[in-house]
A protein has these predicted regions:
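Alpha/beta-hydrolase active-site loop
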Residues: 114-135
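Short alpha-helix in the alpha/beta-hydrolase fold that links the catalytic acid
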Residues: 84, 207, 221-231
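An N-terminal hydrophobic leader/cap segment in hydrolases
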Residues: 13-43, 48-58
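C-terminal catalytic histidine-bearing segment of alpha/beta-hydrolase fold enzymes
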Residues: 236-276
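Hydrolase active-site cap/lid region
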Residues: 151-195, 201
Length: 276
């Protein structure tokens, strides 16, 4: 099953929708990878119902007492990120996966498949982050966002209590992204009105922030992540982790003995205050 999920991850890396493309059916559950987990069912302030999984740290490694909430991208559902969750679990992390409204087994939500994202997804992430903090008050709790999920991740980190943010394939400008999509493929992708304020978000992120990017990522250039890190002001700790590869290939490229093991070690180094 783990091999099948790795194949799914590889296909996912090469099939980004660049607009919303949710799927309802889970391709696996955590127990199929031998992961210890529990299910969650949350209600957001605006009454959406969210399905989630909390994957516990592997029993064979020291517990880092750190909870990582996963904000994935624009396609599929949380089951497609079980391989990343497994790698983090094997590194001693608790991993909180969830489905946005309209994705997976969460409640229905009318989605325009030409839309890049909805602000309601930030409400979903904020709800899950708050639940994680409530369940594990003595745990360090933060967010790892991928692609579109970096929009929600940075917005929530800027406005909520968040101990750290990891952003791979960081979206620096939704407006430039949709313009690039149109230039490349003549595909029209729309933005919510709230996107007009997104340029102000990065400067408000106060927690430690690790930006992960590929040298060959043409969609979210590594230079954008470098610029955000260099713009850090006093007491804003930001660092860039780069790898040789394309969009969202970080776990795949930063692998030595096991899938994503080097990636997880670099996250651990960052959270410990060490530089790569």
């Amino acid at each position: 099953m783990h091999r099948l999920l790795l194949v799914s991850c590889f296909l996912l890396l090469n099939s980004w929708a660049w607009a919303l493309k949710p799927t309802r059916e889970w391709i696996a559950t955590p127990d199929s990878l031998g992961l210890r987990y529990q299910t969650t069912a949350l209600s957001t302030p605006d009454h959406a119902q969210l399905a989630g999984w909390i994957v516990e740290p592997a029993a064979t490694v020291p517990d880092r007492h750190t909870t990582v909430v996963v904000a994935y991208g624009d396609a599929n559902n949380m089951s497609h990120f079980l391989s990343q969750a497994r790698a983090l679990s094997q590194g001693g992390y608790r991993v909180y996966l969830f489905d946005y409204r309209g994705f997976g087994h969460s409640s229905d939500f009318a989605i325009d498949r030409q839309r890049l994202y909805y602000p309601e997804f930030s409400t979903d992430l904020r709800t899950v982050l708050a639940d994680a903090r409530h369940r594990y008050p003595r745990s360090r709790t933060g967010i790892i966002g991928f692609s579109m999920g970096t929009i929600m991740g940075s917005e929530v980190a800027a406005t909520s209590k968040c101990d750290f943010l990891v952003a791979e394939g960081y979206v620096a400008s939704p407006q430039l992204l949709v313009a690039a999509i149109f230039q490349r493929s003549q595909k029209v992708v729309t933005l919510p009105a709230e996107a007009a304020e997104y340029a102000l978000v990065a400067r408000r992120v106060r927690c430690p922030w690790l930006l992960v990017g590929g040298t060959a990522d043409k969609s979210m250039p590594l230079a954008d992540s470098v610029a955000v890190a260099r713009a850090a002001r006093w007491r804003q700790r930001r660092q860039v982790l780069c790898f040789e590869g394309g969009h969202l290939e970080g776990f795949y490229r930063l692998t030595e003995a096991e899938y994503g093991d080097k990636y997880v070690r670099e996250v651990t180094r960052f959270l410990a205050g060490k530089r790569s």
